[in-house]
Regions:
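Alpha-helical transmembrane segments of multi-pass integral membrane proteins
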Residues: 36, 60-64, 97-102, 106-113, ...
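Aromatic- and glycine-rich beta-strand/loop motifs that create alpha-glucan
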Residues: 16-67, 303
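Short hydrophobic, aromatic-rich alpha-helical segments embedded in or entering the lipid bilayer
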Residues: 2-7, 40-48, 225, 229-273
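Junction motif at the cytosolic side of a transmembrane helix
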Residues: 2-23, 162, 259-266, 273-303
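Alpha-helical transmembrane segments and their short interhelical loops
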Residues: 134, 138-216, 266-293
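Transmembrane helix-loop junction
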Residues: 76-81, 126, 130, 161, ...
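Hydrophobic alpha-helical transmembrane segments of multi-pass membrane transport proteins
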Residues: 70-75, 91-167, 199, 218
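Transmembrane helix segments
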Residues: 75-82, 203-249
Length: 303
């Protein structure tokens, strides 16, 4: 019995029996549909795999929360005397939603590094030759990263008031209540979904984590800084336009509107409907581009 390998599709063909596996040119489309587990089972499996991988790395959990908390406490204390936001808002209060979005971004983006690792270990190639829609791979990775990002961002939002009670953030009024908690969680999930899809787009063509970190430094970190998270738009006209054209600006502004304790503090922000619309459109564009990129036949996908 001889066995040959179809290099184009990366599947085995049993030459003696004539059994052709999914992926060959003669494989019937009806058989492919019958062999496919559908869209959502692979999505659930891949998302669950991302969660298991994360919670097995306990140092990653500490680092994901520890660094943003240190940022917030130190910058909040250092700049509190020289900054007053809208409606006399303290810097600790102004920076609070910005740090929550920073946690969303870095957790979502870093979770997509697993794409590079999976390709190196051969797992990704196995998924690509499986009879599942390419959208399942994208959505599985994106949903897994989104869940992790939202959980960590929520953990920070609940830890913040506790830090204010012990004197580390005396000027904080978090704005998170039982009334607006569902809206906060829903909007965090939407922003996290968008950012994870963006991370997928960046990670997919990468061959090494070093290149991914370089993109993080020159593109994603400025994207967060120029979203109104760290400082509000100033007198500079060009800087104000850059901030307005940044899709993440509307994610930060939407979260500020939901958590606002003083309506006067958010009067200058984009309208709520605009924040929601831009965030949804950005997420749809990122996911659509990710599905298209994953579905392309290329030598890179086969590696």
């Amino acid at each position: 019995m001889t066995t040959s390998v179809d290099r184009t599709d990366g599947v085995l063909i049993d030459g003696s029996a004539g059994a052709i596996q999914p992926g060959s040119a003669r494989f019937d489309h009806g058989q492919r549909r019958a062999a496919s587990p559908g869209l959502w089972l692979p999505v659930y499996t891949l998302a669950h795999r991302e969660l298991v991988r994360f919670f097995r790395q306990r140092t990653r959990i500490v680092g994901a929360l520890g660094q943003p908390i240190i940022f917030w406490v130190l910058f909040g204390a250092g700049l509190s005397g020289s900054f007053r936001g809208p409606a006399d808002m303290s810097y600790q209060e102004y920076f609070f939603p910005g740090v929550a979005v920073m946690i969303l971004m870095f957790t979502a983006i870093y979770s997509t590094i697993s794409i590079i690792e999976d390709r190196r270990e051969g797992f990704l190639q196995g998924v690509l030759v499986a009879p599942i829609p390419r959208a399942s791979l994208v959505l599985g990775k994106v949903f897994g990263g989104t869940i992790l990002a939202v959980l960590q961002s929520l953990a920070f939002l609940t830890v913040g008031p506790a830090l204010s009670l012990v004197g580390l953030a005396p000027e904080l009024h978090s704005g998170l209540t039982w009334v607006n908690a569902p809206a906060v969680i829903g909007f965090l999930a939407l922003v996290g979904f968008s950012l994870t899809a963006l991370g997928y787009l960046i990670a997919w063509p990468m061959d090494s984590t070093h290149g991914f970190h370089a993109i993080m430094s020159v593109f994603l970190l400025p994207m967060w800084l120029l979203s109104g998270s760290f400082f509000p738009p100033g007198e500079s006209v060009w800087l104000s336009w850059v901030i307005r054209l940044n899709p993440l600006t509307y994610g930060v502004a939407g979260l500020r509107r939901i958590m606002a304790t003083n309506p006067a503090a958010v009067e200058a922000l984009p309208a709520w409907w605009l924040c929601l619309t831009v965030t949804v459109l950005a997420a749809a564009c990122y996911v659509g581009a990710a599905v298209w990129m994953t579905g392309r036949r290329s030598a890179h996908n086969a590696r």
